[in-house]
């Protein structure tokens, strides 16, 4: 897969890192789905986006059209399966607990298309400790923001 083939991004985890990563992806033109098991976190993440984008317009960092398109590019769901089903690239930003990350990656392996790259945003857990939870260890990597 070539970088130009990446159109759809799934961000797992709607906390501080996750929702900001998802927002950045949406601003840069990717169809982005942010997912979390917590409806409360998803609501907070969506509220952040709805406040952040107009704020960037006010500061002259984005045009109104860019902000509008970014908002159209991002959606939120509590369903990991729904979030991952069309992903070309997945960025996991869940809690720094190895067992949880391994479970998330095992589920992503089932739900994401075979071509999808699965990245962890972890700064403490290397991808080699997660990769074997999938059937695609060669497509698992660390990507830290």
Q: Where would I find each of the regions flagged by the language model?
A:
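NAD(P)+-binding Rossmann beta1-loop-alpha1 motif at the extreme N-terminus of oxidoreductases
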Residues: 1-55, 59
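Phosphate-coordination loops involved in phosphoryl transfer and adenosine-cofactor binding
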Residues: 3-8, 86-87, 115
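Structural motif
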Residues: 12, 20, 77, 93, ...
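Generic structural signal for residues in well-ordered beta-strands
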Residues: 32, 74-76, 140
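A structured beta-alpha segment of the ubiquitous adenosine-cofactor-binding alpha/beta core
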Residues: 56-111
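Rossmann-fold NAD(P)-binding glycine/threonine-rich loop
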Residues: 102-145
